[in-house]
Amino acid sequence: MSTPGIDPAIADFIAKVVHIGSAYDLDGMERLYTADQTFLILTSEGEVIRLTRAQVFDEFRARRDAGEPPLATEYRVLHVEEQGQDAVALLYRRMSPAAPPVLYELRLRKGPGGWAVAGETVTPWPGAEGGSFLPPRTRAA
């Protein structure tokens, strides 16, 4: 997905994050996320849920191991703000037709190996119904 005015390296990195994560490819995800990565979810009730990298990976592992279908790869880069070795990307993201769209904020950090996700924030898409950003599980873990 090419977005005018965005560093092609960041655009390519975001595409990898979406496609590798959507496939529950934990080995691939290991290379894309910093060791101290955090995940914040703003609920439709205004509460913030903070998850560690390990908690997010555990959820994706459980979904993969239970045979859940891959997540949808629907996304659109809305804006990227780059400041030296840091960048913030705002994305429209929809994980499944069974889950509402969300606004994704990716906090990126550039290191010797290139870009990595240092944090993510997920908020309800304006005007969308609240709910989990992941689709409901169809299989037990």
For the regions a language model picked out, list residue spans one by one.
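Short, low-complexity N-terminal intrinsically disordered segments enriched in polar/charged residues
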Residues: M1-D36, Q55, A128-A141
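Surface-exposed, charged secondary-structure patches
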Residues: S2, I6-D12, T38-E45, L51-P100
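Generic structural signal for secondary-structure transition and capping sites
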Residues: L26, T38, D65-P69, G113, ...
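Generic detector of low-complexity/intrinsically disordered segments
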Residues: G28, S44, T73, Y92-R93, ...
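Short beta-strand segments enriched in hydrophobic/aromatic residues
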Residues: Y33-T34, R93-M95, T121-P124
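Short, solvent-exposed coil/turn segments at beta-strand boundaries
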Residues: D36, E82-D86, K110-A116
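Short beta-strand edge/turn micro-motifs at domain boundaries
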Residues: P101-P135
